[in-house]
Amino acid sequence: ASFSEAPPGNPDAGAKIFKTKCAQCHTVDAGAGHKQGPNLHGLFGRQSGTTAGYSYSAANKNKAVEWEENTLYDYLLNPKKYIPGTKMVFPGLKKPQDRADLIAYLKKATSS
């Protein structure tokens, strides 16, 4: 199923998902450094594998996908299937509501 069929996302619920599933490896704050994973500030509209100062896998660079709702929705279901060879160890979020909530949070948090 695509993002267009996803339930409406709740950014507050997404913030909790980010805190428990993502924050150990990612930050969303402007000017914050990278952790195990890249800083996600400015994520929407950016091409995969292009954040300055982060060492991406060749797979992430070569995928050359632009991050937006549709691509994130597919990626977050199963990162290793979407980008075989990615360094991201996270297995994915199987529930459409969880993905929609996380994307709603990221849209808000990575642009402020």
Swiss-Prot record:
Q: What GO biological process, any one, is recorded here?
A: mitochondrial electron transport, ubiquinol to cytochrome c
Give a Gene Ontology cellular component term annotated to this protein.
mitochondrial intermembrane space
Q: Where in the cell is it found?
A: Mitochondrion intermembrane space
Give this protein's Gene Ontology molecular function annotations.
electron transfer activity; heme binding; metal ion binding
Instruction: Provide the positions where the record notes the PTM N-acetylalanine.
Output: A1
InterPro entries assigned to the protein according to its UniProt record, in alphabetical order: Cyt_c-like_dom, Cyt_c-like_dom_sf, Cyt_c_1A/1B
Q: Which UniProt keywords apply?
A: Acetylation, Electron transport, Heme, Iron, Metal-binding, Methylation, Mitochondrion, Respiratory chain, Transport
What PROSITE patterns does its record include?
CYTC
Q: Which residues carry this modification: N6,N6,N6-trimethyllysine?
A: K80, K94
What residues bind heme c, as annotated? C22, C25, H26, M88
Q: Which domain of life is it from?
A: Eukaryota
- Processing after translation: Binds 1 heme c group covalently per subunit.
Functional description taken from the UniProt entry: Electron carrier protein. The oxidized form of the cytochrome c heme group can accept an electron from the heme group of the cytochrome c1 subunit of cytochrome reductase. Cytochrome c then transfers this electron to the cytochrome oxidase complex, the final protein carrier in the mitochondrial electron-transport chain.
- What does the miscellaneous comment read? The tentative assignment of Gln-24 and Glu-69 is based on indirect evidence (electrophoretic mobilities and comparisons with other cytochromes c).
Q: Its family?
A: Belongs to the cytochrome c family.
Please identify the protein, giving its name as recorded. Answer: Cytochrome c
